[in-house]
């Protein structure tokens, strides 16, 4: 019987506000011993610096492997490299547009396109408001080709006391899509 490989997920962090979702996803994947492959756009790095106290190196060290956004020859740019899916957290309008239109001008969008063509799960935590019809059409187009749109909408039935609790609830729901159980995640009616 062949050896089982570890669960392997790609995490993309773009320049949209809400980079804490991507950072927390990496932290939880590490806690769950999930192999994570990270791509951060240049604007993602800028937003990390603006929104958090994390140094880029600290975020990168959370991942099992890190790739430069311009490295289109990276292993995750090929469907022959086995991964279980990809999470873009947060997902900018630019990235949503690239995914919806199959545009592969950087490693993050190439990896997303490969994820879809290989029929693997791609979650886009689209972070924009308010929306105009063009945004809605892009979301519909991305959904039609297989992406899962999961805007980081907070839930309040858990009676969150901190921003961290709001973030954890959303990250936990995303990881549910791979059958990964986030410790301490509050569920409806439980």
Residue positions per predicted region:
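A cross-family phosphate/adenosyl-ligand binding-site feature
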Residues: 1-123, 127-190
